Amino acid sequence: MDNFQGDLTDVVRGIGSGHVSPSPGPPEGPSPSSMSPPPTSDLHVEFPSAATSASCLANPFGDPFVSMKDPLIHLPASYISGAGDNKSNKSFAIFPKIFEDDHIKSQCSVFPRIKISQSNNIHDASTCNSPAITVSSAAVAASPWGMINVNTTNSPRNCLLVDNNNNTSSCSQVQISSSPRNLGIKRRKSQAKKVVCIPAPAAMNSRSSGEVVPSDLWAWRKYGQKPIKGSPYPRGYYRCSSSKGCSARKQVERSRTDPNMLVITYTSEHNHPWPTQRNALAGSTRSSSSSSLNPSSKSSTAAATTSPSSRVFQNNSSKDEPNNSNLPSSSTHPPFDAAAIKEENVEERQEKMEFDYNDVENTYRPELLQEFQHQPEDFFADLDELEGDSLTMLLSHSSGGGNMENKTTIPDVFSDFFDDDESSRSL
């Protein structure tokens, strides 16, 4: 047909024959070797030329955009790795990998991207220079957060790859070993313990629960008691009272197999020298030998604890009774029983108190004022004493008893009174 006019089939055939060049030859598309760098614009899009539109023949409507793919995907790798220093080329080189990676959703992510990959080998620090990691680090450069790449390996240690977002795109490898948690807890220092088994001494009192601990020349103070499971006897806890900073401890309990044996467990060592006998007996737990001490030591302690007034009374009694044979002498007599010594001390105190009371009555005189000290003793000597009570005298006269003299004297007095009255009337 002339001028390509006719039905629709002729039009389509005319379009295909007019645009297809039958001459063979190399394609006119750009080759990788002779390709010039694209312009610096980020919105650069290359459209296919008329010679490369042979693929559009399958489209019956001749739409050139239907079969067109993304031109950025088919760019060579040399162009991506050889991007310039300017920011526009660098940002343009980021887009292909972002489109190719399915995990990255957007370029400017506010939160860090955590990528977990399983491998059998621990990645070296040299893997940070790979193009994928370089592109990923550059992709999150605009984000204030970094990208953490966690590699779970078969080894017992877990490695964390943290990308430092700097201009050189260098990454540093931080390894955090999953060590056991109990290593940070300090164990208690192993203390030396010494166990001693000795026969249990008999209790001094009648109570069966009384615990008697033998003396070991150290001063101990009981600070606790705990019942033992399966044993009727408790366990006592003691600490050293000789020195304030001593860490020595001991535990006293009866043996489960033989109740007549004491099991003493010493913990730690004393950091001070041996105490004296006085300091050893200063604690609450005294040995049984302390109850049978000689009376001289007890009398000396009793004298040291007496008040000053009792000392004065003792001096007075010693002056009045220098030869007192009832007092026991500490050098000649053997040790007495504690109860007998206590009774003697009580009797001596009572005697001293009675003596002091009598002495006070004899020697005490109240101090009078000076104006009364020079008065004679016969101050009331000039006064006469009444022979009888006047009231009794009047009662005796009214009752009719008594002396006749008194009866006669009383009417005479009244008679004189009445006589004087009659004489005055007559005048």
UniProtKB/Swiss-Prot annotation:
Q: Where is the composition biased (Low complexity)?
A: 284-310
Query: Per the UniProt entry, what is one GO biological process?
Result: pollen development
Single annotated GO MF: sequence-specific DNA binding
Start and end residues of each stretch annotated as Disordered: 1-45, 266-336
Keywords, ordered alphabetically:
DNA-binding, Nucleus, Transcription, Transcription regulation
Which superkingdom, per the lineage?
Answer: Eukaryota
UniProt KW Nucleus keyword = yes
GO cellular component assignments: nucleus
- Which SMART domains does this UniProt record tie to the protein? WRKY (SM00774)
- Which InterPro entries does the entry mention? WRKY_dom (IPR003657), WRKY_dom_sf (IPR036576), WRKY_plant (IPR044810)
* Record field: compositional bias (Pro residues): 23-40
* Compositional bias per record (Polar residues), positions renumbered to this chain: 311-333
Q: Which residues bind DNA?
A: 209-275
Cellular location of this protein? Answer: Nucleus
Family that this chain belongs to: Belongs to the WRKY group II-e family.
Q: What does this protein do?
A: Transcription factor. Interacts specifically with the W box (5'-(T)TGAC[CT]-3'), a frequently occurring elicitor-responsive cis-acting element.
Q: What is the protein named? A: Probable WRKY transcription factor 35
The gene it comes from is WRKY35
